UniProtKB/Swiss-Prot annotation:
Organism this protein belongs to: Parabacteroides distasonis (strain ATCC 8503 / DSM 20701 / CIP 104284 / JCM 5825 / NCTC 11152)
One family name in Pfam for this protein: Val_tRNA-synt_C
Physiological role: Catalyzes the attachment of valine to tRNA(Val). As ValRS can inadvertently accommodate and process structurally similar amino acids such as threonine, to avoid such errors, it has a 'posttransfer' editing activity that hydrolyzes mischarged Thr-tRNA(Val) in a tRNA-dependent manner.
The reaction(s) this protein catalyses: tRNA(Val) + L-valine + ATP = L-valyl-tRNA(Val) + AMP + diphosphate
Residues spanned by motif 'HIGH' region: 43-53
Enzyme Commission numbers on file: 6.1.1.9
Domain notes: ValRS has two distinct active sites: one for aminoacylation and one for editing. The misactivated threonine is translocated from the active site to the editing site.
Nucleotide-binding in keyword set: yes
Name listed for the protein in its UniProt record: Valine--tRNA ligase
NCBIfam families: PRK05729.1, valS
Taxonomy of the source species: Bacteria, Pseudomonadati, Bacteroidota, Bacteroidia, Bacteroidales
Length: 873
């Protein structure tokens, strides 16, 4: 196979990806091997590839490819999430562009448009993942609203309802006025906002005075049904048992007492608006207060408000400030910073709202799912996220699972003509239950009305590791029994509650065991300034453009260079460039080796025999390090170990030791050993850099059709002779010392040198030292030659006689000039350090730096003086 002079990723990547697909290397079926299973965190069907996906899927692919090469039956299941809120918003926007409102359509008509949109745009991200090299079993591609997944979701809802864990009721929920749906607590992001604190006057009934309330939300006073004071607050005792009048509204409301009220906040008086504040709602329940819902679903004021009807809540805030001021009912306004809840999906401030919703009781499920993580039955990498998990599990609230949308799994509850409802998996079963419940055998489906709401998107994805293998509908099928529990989950810590915790709950509830054995938490990809990458900041590169520019292997490596588990990733294009440079290094090394002429008749040189023995041990040592790093999920460390092995040990040392002289042949034994090493290196690198390694492995020797590095065996650990490796490190220091002398004295590499040794020395490596340094002789001496330049390695002195290789007078002049400069520099540093004023005022770091300059200068002066002494002997 001909190897091009330059590596061209564009030519190589598509060719080998298609080859892998054609040969079915990504496919998996249950067999006798140990399974290795990963389920993809399903990206939104609306999505396109971003840097977070790139990182997450690179890590998954590394794990899957390595498992495959370890002889396991690797199964990586891809899929997408229907993403109710995000997808519905996209469809609504597209319809708006055509002049169609959602309200103009029936549910079925809207869903037809949604499915059309999904068919057009859904799956784009999965196609893009192929460019990255993702080795998923594409035949298994799933969608959270496909038939099997939908059946699973409905079945689980009915089951949990029958168990008494799902209930329906009016509760305070987080309402998204833009998406027009309830949200779970986890879908609310709290941000620090620059707000105002308004001090409002409430007239005390039957008195001249006012009670003053401080609030950030004057627009909600139309929903006030009480004022509350702390019974232990001396400054508000005069309000006990009184009534006050809501400003502008004119409604009399009672003053109630509860120690919930913070005496230190504002005036110590609290306005109670049970329909629009979580804490006020609890007070309302406790004191049986009426609730007045003054907001429409879209955040405008409703008829119940009586004032400002139809106006947006934030417009009302501005208007009511003016109206209160004009009425003399606004005492003052202060600047105030507070945390405001925003919808994670639409980024608008949420509205606490009383609403009839469906909820899932979480306490029972959380208790079961906490212990396995805390006892490390399910391992978290890094383990710091165990505390985050525990805190959430111990403070869990019921999960609001209903959403006021049309795109999603419709709740299988059917309302009866006379009130009440039944819950069933199908319309037929619902009708049977309805007839029984109503005692009316003549009921038809037209008499029943299915709940309009759909389930929270996470209610389908929490079943993902089970439903992908149809384990809900067919709990004893071959695939679920073979592939479950899955092996590793790779995900971001931002969805530890949304998804990870809930999957663990579902796993124990429906399989009686963990859904995965380990969770690898990736970090957040940030830019060079430490900002999270986002469209709005314009700081996120297009991953496909990066692949085009640097090649998929270059980008994969760039990501992994910066990606230790659980730490944020400071991403820079320069990392991809480093990855591309490594590709070129591998390519050029391969071309060098394959360009050698082999001569079967020549014996293996001693230096080459030593090099082969040494590199075999170096390789075995790295294999052990890589295995250890993978066992601890330190993938970046594993990659760096192979990177250094190839770049430093193989390219800079081994190839230099064995390469033949210019236009000279190489012996067969060394050549075959070198090809064997290259083969092992390509195997180690393949999970990280699949494309270039496959291209070179195929060119390493003739291959049969259907052979692939993808399914080749990973190199195994062997016994390592650490003493031999340690001894070779001394060789490196000796070679480095001689090369430094060449550099300092401008002696060309073609000029052979002598090496004299004073002290202990292991002669076993002399052949390597002679070759690497171009030495004419290596000899042990009692005393080095006059004019020789020397260096120490451990306690042994190595000297290079310079003889006629340099002009002694010129060299002495240069050294004297350098000595003069260094002494002058040292004097200036000492003057500074001797200045008490400087020493007393300068920061400790500056003093430390000056002392380092002193030590460096003294060291250089000593070295120069020794060199002068050697030349003048």
């Amino acid at each position: 196979m001909e190897i091009a002079s330059k590596y061209n990723p564009a030519e190589v990547e598509g060719k080998w990806y298609q080859y892998w697909l054609d040969n079915g290397f990504f496919k998996s079926k249950p067999d006798g091997r140990e399974p290795y299973t990963i389920v993809i965190p399903p990206p939104n069907v609306t999505g396109v590839l971003h840097m977070g996906h790139m990182l997450n899927n690179t890590i998954q692919d590394i794990l899957v490819r390595r498992a495959r090469m370890m002889g396991k039956n690797a199964c990586w299941v891809p899929g997408t999430d229907h993403a109710s809120i995000a997808t519905e918003a996209k469809v609504v926007n597209r319809l708006a562009g055509q002049g169609i409102k959602k309200t103009d359509l029936t549910r079925d008509e809207f869903l037809r448009h949604a499915w059309e949109w999904k068919e057009e745009h859904g799956g784009i991200i999965l196609k893009q993942l192929r460019k990255l090299g993702a080795s998923c079993d594409w035949d298994r591609t799933a969608f959270t609203m496909d038939e099997k997944r939908s059946e699973s979701v409905i079945k689980v809802f009915v089951d949990l309802y029958k168990k008494g864990l799902i209930y329906r009721g009016v509760r305070m929920v987080n309402w998204d006025p833009k998406a027009l749906t309830a949200l779970s607590d986890e879908e609310v992001i709290y941000k620090e906002e620059h707000s105002k604190l308004y001090y409002l006057r409430y007239k005390i009934v039957g008195e001249e005075g006012y009670a003053v309330v401080a609030t950030t939300r004057p627009e909600t006073i139309m929903g006030d049904t009480a004022m509350c004071i702390n019974p232990n607050d001396p400054k508000n005792q005069h309000l006990r048992g009184k009534k006050v009048i809501v400003p502008l509204v004119g409604r009399e409301i009672p003053v109630i007492e509860d120690d919930y009220v913070d005496i230190e906040f504002g005036t110590g008086c609290l306005k109670v608006t049970p329909a629009h504040d979580v804490n006020d709602y609890m007070l309302g329940e406790k004191y049986n207060l009426p609730s007045i819902d003054i907001f429409n679903d879209n955040g405008t004021l409703s008829e119940a408000a009586g004032l400002y009807v139809g106006m947006d809540r934030f417009d009302v805030r501005k208007q009511i400030e003016e109206d209160l001021r004009n009425a003399g009912l606004l005492e003052k306004v202060e600047a105030y910073e507070n945390k405001v809840g925003f919808s994670e999906r639409t980024n608008v401030p949420i509205e606490p709202k009383l609403s009839m919703q469906w909820f899932l009781k979480m306490e029972h499920l959380a208790q079961i799912a906490l212990e396995p993580v805390m006892k490390d039955d399910i391992k978290f990498y890094p383990p710091k996220f165990k505390n985050t998990y525990r805190h959430w599990m111990e403070n869990i609230k019921d999960w609001c699972i209903s959403r006021q949308l049309w795109w999603g799994h419709r709740i299988p509850a059917y309302f009866l003509p006379e009130g009440g409802y039944v819950v069933a998996e199908t319309e037929e079963k619902a009708l049977e239950l309805a007839k029984e419940k109503c005692g009316n055998p003549n009921l038809t489906m037209s008499d029943l009305r299915q709940d309009e709401d759909v389930l929270d998107t996470w209610f389908s994805s929490w079943l993902w590791p089970i439903s992908l293998f149809d384990g809900i509908n067919n709990p004893d099928n071959e695939e679920i029994n073979y592939y479950y529990p899955t092996s590793d989950l790779v995900t971001g810590p931002d969805i530890i509650f949304f998804w990870v915790a809930r999957m663990i709950m579902a796993g124990y509830e429906y399989r009686g065991k963990m859904p995965f054995k380990s969770v690898y938490f990736t970090g957040i990809v940030r830019d060079k300034l430490g900002r999270k990458m986002s469209k709005s900041l314009g700081n996120s590169p297009d991953p496909l453009q990066l692949i085009e520019q640097y090649g998929a292997d270059g980008v994969r490596m760039g990501l992994m260079l910066a990606a230790p588990a659980g730490n944020d990733i400071p991403f820079d294009d320069a990392l991809c460039e480093q990855g591309r440079n490594f590709n070129n290094k591998i390519w050029n090394a391969f071309r060098l080796v394959k360009g050698w002429t082999v001569d079967d008749t020549i014996a293996q040189p001693e230096a080459s025999a030593i090099a082969v023995k040494w590199f075999k041990m170096q390789l075995d040592k790295t294999i052990a390090e890589v295995d250890d790093s993978f066992s601890k999920y330190r993938l970046s460390e594993a990659m760096m170990a192979v990177y250094k092995l190839f770049w430093d040990e193989f390219s800079s040392w081994y190839l230099e030791m064995v390469k033949p002289g210019y236009q000279q042949p190489i012996d067969k034994a060394t050549y075959e050993a070198t090809l064997g090493f290259f083969d092992a290196l390509l195997r180690l690198l393949h999970p990280f850099m699949p494309f270039i390694t496959e291209e070179l492995w195929q060119a390493l020797e003739p291959r049969k059709e259907g052979e692939s590095l993808m399914v080749a065996q990973m190199p195994e650990i062997a016994v390592i002779d650490s003493a031999y490796l340690d001894a070779f490190e001394i060789v490196k220091e000796i070679v480095g010392g001689v090369r430094t002398i060449r550099l300092q004295k401008n002696i060309p590499n073609k000029d052979a040198l002598e090496l004299q040794i004073v002290g202990e020395h292991n002669e076993a490596f002399n052949a390597v030292i002679a070759k690497m340094c171009n030495l004419s002789s290596i000899s042990k001496v009692e005393e080095k030659a006059a004019g020789a330049v020397s260096f120490l390695v451990r306690t042994t002195e190595y000297a290079v006689p310079l003889g006629n290789l340099i002009n002694v007078e010129e060299e002495l002049a240069k050294l004297q000039e350098e000595l003069k400069y260094q002494k002058g520099f040292l004097a200036s540093v000492m003057k500074k350090l001797g200045n008490e004023n400087f020493v007393s005022k300068a920061p400790a770091k500056v003093i430390e730096m000056e002392k380092k300059k002193q030590a460096d200068a003294e060291s250089k002066i000593k070295s120069i003086e020794e060199s002068i002494a050697a030349l003048t002997k």
